């Protein structure tokens, strides 16, 4: 008598998560509702297309493919080779470069792979101070980059919070770093990659540009391109690029390209996530369309509208504005910590993240600032008018918190108005 196994039954291949696992389905539905009903201002988040979701949830999740197209350690890779080659070609076209590795699982792992190529433990490198807008992987002591290597930092000028290139030059001259990192996670202004290359050449360093936050703006021509100045570029594929969560490494140097590929696999990772690479290919294809250029322009226009609105209700904006998708809000005039602001705004239906500001006297889990951004709101259709209103709501909520009175009535009022706005701009409906 033939007995069907679970894996060969119709239910296994046809049953969706709703009937197969109601507990997980309920959680997924809850997250969908949260995203639909809240205004997402976290600068590192975005909303992907249905096409990207479809690719990431595809049968490619079944396939192991250690190695690279045409040079795999497994059979049956002829189809996944096609999608990885497509992702690579689209990435090269977007950035105008000669080589792209689309396998890194994250931006952090992309950075780790570059460190493996360019340094040995104990070597010195230079990155932006985390409190001034840098990133954890640029030398923070709690991160691998700070534990294995010897980081030195440059920062921003006290008077205008713009990158202090003179300081960067002096720090580089004094320390002779092997690598200089240009880029950050909370720096809102243009970065002069040409000037960083000049500093790198002066001290014989490799210039690594981490453009994780700016990638979508770069490929749309709305933010300076690190090429031809960078030796190596790392990025995430989400954020402003509006793809799946993942990483990527780019270069024009053939010798570095070969070393980078070896560092990613087998040096750092095993099998690549082919379903994610397929989703990257889809997102890169979207970014090559004229509509994406319009989107990137709108992201920046919206960010400037939000910054102006926040200033109009009494907030300081670090560097007094933005050239990109994000801004740092200095909360000290309101006497509210970033942690308290984040919690109150979430109760009101607005999602942000606490963030240190230059010279911040508060610890990282409290902070004197908020980081806010416009990519997700722009994706769902918000324009300057909507973002000006969002700025006013932030002012209302945080003024209520600062007053010392119970902020609940104001939070609930704003929550209702936020919900009405999000209903006008639905996602995945």
Curated annotation (Swiss-Prot):
It catalyses: (6R)-5,10-methylene-5,6,7,8-tetrahydrofolate + glycine + H2O = (6S)-5,6,7,8-tetrahydrofolate + L-serine. Pfam families: SHMT (PF00464). InterPro entries: PyrdxlP-dep_Trfase (IPR015424), PyrdxlP-dep_Trfase_major (IPR015421), PyrdxlP-dep_Trfase_small (IPR015422), Ser_HO-MeTrfase (IPR001085), Ser_HO-MeTrfase-like (IPR049943), Ser_HO-MeTrfase_PLP_BS (IPR019798), SHMT-like_dom (IPR039429). (6S)-5,6,7,8-tetrahydrofolate binds at residues 130, 134-136. Its main location: cytoplasm. Its cofactor is pyridoxal 5'-phosphate. GO terms for molecular function: glycine hydroxymethyltransferase activity; pyridoxal phosphate binding. Keywords: Amino-acid biosynthesis, Cytoplasm, One-carbon metabolism, Pyridoxal phosphate, Transferase. Pathway: One-carbon metabolism; tetrahydrofolate interconversion; Amino-acid biosynthesis; glycine biosynthesis; glycine from L-serine: step 1/1. GO terms for cellular component: cytosol. The record marks 238 as: Plays an important role in substrate specificity. It comes from the Bacteria. It is found in: Cytoplasm. Homodimer. Belongs to the SHMT family. Catalyzes the reversible interconversion of serine and glycine with tetrahydrofolate (THF) serving as the one-carbon carrier. This reaction serves as the major source of one-carbon groups required for the biosynthesis of purines, thymidylate, methionine, and other important biomolecules. Also exhibits THF-independent aldolase activity toward beta-hydroxyamino acids, producing glycine and aldehydes, via a retro-aldol mechanism. PANTHER family: SERINE HYDROXYMETHYLTRANSFERASE (PTHR11680), SERINE HYDROXYMETHYLTRANSFERASE 1 (PTHR11680:SF35). This is Serine hydroxymethyltransferase. It comes from Phenylobacterium zucineum (strain HLK1). The gene is glyA.
